Amino acid sequence: MTVTGGSSSLVVPMVMWGRHPPVHCISAIYLLRDQKTLVSGSTDGQVFLWEVDATSDKWEMTPRHVLVGHTAPIKCIAKASGGADAHHIVTSSENGEMFCWDTEDGRCIENKKLPGLIHTHIQAYRSPDTQGSGTNSGNTGPSGVKLFCCGFYEEIIAMDPFSLTVIFQLSSRINPDWVASFHVLRPRNRQDDVVLGKSYFLFSYFFRYFILY
């Protein structure tokens, strides 16, 4: 719909919900920390935002937004900002597309396609050193969150969740291979962050430690 007034015009998108819901074959799902918004990605590239009502014994979900932009099935969904009231997410599809969304209004903040970087797992991590300080250290987004990603490549990639740019890469000097899984954590009695990764090599599992300074 286009609203005109004088010499200016405003394009207002409108969505009409029919009697029957659209087909939505879920390929990825994520519940925001406040447990009020559920995000689901589908095999056709659409992302649904659901309003969750957990006041009763049975959780009721009502569709609120349909986010359109991906052209391939969604593989990963992760938060892009920290805190209990965080409302930014990042979605990644199997053709390398990445989108940063605002879940309050459904707005797309940034999108990029990174050829050769097909993510299969994304973990959003905020170092304890930046929590509560309001700082933006390490070239991270406004919340201090980094996205750690692995997939069909030999490294663990750290990305900025809002600009969707690569900050740094972690790779093994010995027998580099696709990383099957990983976890970022701050061990007890340590002042640095550690990435524990597991890769496939000759059908065996190798655990590798990467220390983040």
Regions found by a protein language model. Give the residues of each.
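Intrinsically disordered, low-complexity acidic/Ser/Thr/Pro-rich linker and tail segments
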Residues: 1-27, 43, 48-56, 99, ...
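Terminal intrinsically disordered, low-complexity extensions flanking WD-repeat/beta-propeller proteins
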Residues: 3, 116-120, 130-135, 153-155, ...
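Short C-terminal beta-strands that terminate individual repeats in beta-propeller domains
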Residues: 15-21, 60-69, 108-114, 168-173
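Canonical WD40 repeat/beta-propeller blade segments in eukaryotic WD-repeat proteins
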Residues: 21-31, 71-81, 117-139, 176-187
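Structural hallmark of WD40 beta-propellers
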Residues: 35-39, 84-90, 99, 108-110, ...
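Conserved strand-to-loop turn within each blade of WD40 beta-propeller repeats
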Residues: 41-44, 92-95, 150-153, 198-200
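WD40-repeat beta-propellers
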Residues: 47-51, 98-102, 157-160, 202-208, ...
